[in-house]
Every structure is written in C-alpha cells, then in structure tokens.
Design a protein with these regions (language model features):
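Contiguous, well-ordered alpha-helical segments that form the cores/surfaces of helical PPI scaffolds
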Residues: 91-104, 126
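Conserved catalytic cores of very large enzyme subunits
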Residues: 1-87, 108, 114-118, 122-282
Length: 282
C-alpha cells in the first residue's frame, strides 16, 4: 500500500522508466507569465499558481479516466500485453521559465542565479510539491513534479507572451525568444561546471520526476579517467540526482572533430601558413 501523503520518485531504470511506470500526461506551467502579471505581489502569484495547479489536476484526472476506458475497451492491445494497470503511473506537473519569472517579478533586480532568486524558486517548487501531496490523498493517484524538457513549449510560451505582453522580460533576441528551461540557470551564465552545480543543487533535488543538469565542459577532458574522476567528485559532493557531461568540440568540414571551441580550424590555419611561407620563399 503506497503512502499517498508523500511524493514518490520513479524507481528502476534510467529516469525510472521501467515498464510498469511512466506518466499518464504532463502539464507544464508558464512561470514567466505569472512573474510578469503579479510582479512584486507574492500572495497573488501563489493564488494564481494554485488555480493553475487545480486546473492541471482536473486535466490529468480526466486524461487518466479516458486512457483507462480505452484500455478496458481493448483499444490498447499492445500495451495490455505488458501492462496490467496504470496504478503506478504518475500524473506529471512541470514548470518552465522560472528564471524569467524571478526577473519579471523583481523587475530585473534578481534572477535564478542570485540567493534571493534561488530561495524564491525553492519556495515555489516546495509549494507545488505540497499541493501534489494533497492531490494524491484526494484522488488516490500518484503525482510527480518534473523538470519537463519543454523543447517546443519554451519557444511557444515566449512567442505567445510577447504578443500579449510586449514588455515582458524574456531570453533571446528578435525572433529567437525563449524561456529558460524549468528552473535552470541562464544558458550563458557560466562556463564553470562547479558554479552551475552550486547554483542548481538545491533546486534539482526538489523534482520527483525526471530532471537533469547538463554540464558543458569548456576545457578538454583529457581522458576517460579524468571524466570518471570528475563525475565521482560531483556525486560525492552534491545531492542532485542526474547530470550529463558534454565536452565542447568543433567540427571542421575538412578535418572533422576538434577538441574545444574553435572559431577557425587550427589544422587548416597551419596549412594556410605553410602555403603562405612557400609563396614568400619563392
């Protein structure tokens, strides 16, 4: 018997994606818009957030009923071969644009990289977690909080908001506007992976569904052993559940893969220099 007074984390496999669990559906909340509409008014912001959370619950419960009905009618024959029920499946709620929410709420005095911003984001995520515990007790179904990938949603939210609220603070420029994913730091904020880890550790631990911190290494990782030691250091000193390590590289049409970031290919430059020297010597 599951204790519905606590939020569970998916077990087994990468991101807990074992065959007996998953998400019934995902609702992503546009946090940036809340920050703009209720700037400086925390009470109203939380009131509106609650309204959106209740709408999310209603939507996800209706979807669960619909999927169960389709399953019972035999319209998911392949699923029925390996899945006996949906009781271990989560109703998932996620957030997008937490960084821009803080910037709009504070009129650009803070963002998610400041201590004030981190504390505010943590307060909001904890509030969502508490509401989800209530939803679990009320419905008997599992809920989780996820850093939804929002690859398309982040652009769509920003585009819609720009039409309605021309003065809203967003990331990007011109046509390439977007909101920073979930509660991540701005993409251009730091190249130091340990600074990113310190800024994100508390917030990453608030999620009970899928979340990951991508660490882009501006310097070359010299060997698999060096990467292993780096990962060991991270998991020994930080609590966040998932990380990826991506070395920065460049691709030359002639010489292919090059370690590090290069505006111009150094191998091509060497060839050009040699050719120039030969011409000058002749």
């Amino acid at each position: 018997q599951l204790d519905l007074r606590e939020l569970l984390k998916r077990g087994n496999g990468l991101f807990g994606s074992a065959e007996m669990t998953g998400s019934i559906g995902v609702v992503t909340i546009n946090m940036a818009r809340l920050g703009y509409l209720f700037k400086g008014n925390k009470v109203e912001l939380f009131t509106q957030l609650d309204r959106l959370l209740y709408i999310s619950k209603s939507t996800l419960e209706k979807k669960r009923v619909f999927i169960q009905e389709m399953y019972d009618r035999g319209l998911y024959p392949y699923t029925k071969r390996y899945l006996q029920h949906f009781r271990n499946h989560f109703s998932t709620i996620g957030v997008n644009g937490m960084n821009e929410m803080i910037a709009n709420f504070t009129e650009n005095k803070d963002d998610i990289t400041s201590l004030t911003g981190i504390e505010f984001a943590a307060e909001i995520l904890e509030h969502i977690r508490n509401r989800m515990k209530e939803f679990q007790e009320e419905t008997g179904n599992l809920y989780n909080l996820e850093a939804t990938p929002a690859e398309g949603t982040t652009y769509r939210f920003a585009k819609e908001d720009k039409k309605r609220f021309p003065n809203i603070l967003q990331s990007g420029q011109g046509e390439n506007i977007y909101y920073t994913n979930s509660s991540q730091i701005p993409v251009e904020h730091t190249e130091d992976p340990f600074e990113a880890l310190f800024l994100q550790d508390e917030l990453q631990c608030k999620y009970t569904g899928g979340t990951v911190l991508h660490l882009y290494m501006s310097e070359k990782i010299s060997s698999p052993e060096a990467c292993k030691q780096f990962v060991k250091k991270v998991i020994s000193n930080f609590r966040l559940p998932y990380i990826t390590v991506t070395p920065v590289f460049s691709v030359c049409p002639v010489h292919g893969y090059l370690n590090g970031e290069h505006e111009y290919c150094p191998k091509c430059d060497e060839i050009l220099i040699e050719e120039k020297k030969l011409k000058l010597s002749n």
